[in-house]
Amino acid sequence: MLKQRNMNLKIIVMLGFVAFCFTLQAQQQTVTPDIPVDPDTKKIMYRAVIEEQGSSEYLYNKAIEWFTYYYVNPSAVFTVQDKVNGRIEGTGRMKIYFTDEQSGVRMDGGLIIYLIKIELKENKFRYTLTDFNLKAASRFPVEKWMNKSDPAYNPKWDSYLFQIDTTMQRLVSTLTEKMKPVVKKKDEW
């Protein structure tokens, strides 16, 4: 009776391990995200106009605040800081990774460089994220990764595009959240 329980326990553990491996494999297979592409330039572009209360100067200051919140070294990102015309531009960077199939270790896939532009007007602002390139000896536009019929296609490209999309979605959500006016609570005692 004890031997049969041990055998059943071993089978359950083995089935659990197999299920875990299938789940892990399924998680590593990423679907190509629905990345926004500008129809004119054919480049990846995240862009939207957001209605937000405040003068252009107030929104400019909120945007600068967001840059210091989001980027580790915002002064290395800025290329244009124009408070008078309500414009901030910069060059952002993000790392991409892949998982080594043999060791299962996360490896460095490269550095993505992109342009970020925030334009501010009375009660609204517009962000634009575009010109995504893999840092290499020459420009390597990541739009190439969207072409699955390319003879050089690599399944890792889907993962890289997913990472870019996820990072840009997080960037946009933190930007829109940080641009909201701060509600000051009245100290009632």
Regions found by a protein language model. Name each.
Residues 1-30:
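Bacterial Sec-dependent N-terminal signal peptides
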Residues 27-189:
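Ser/Thr-rich, low-complexity intrinsically disordered terminal regions
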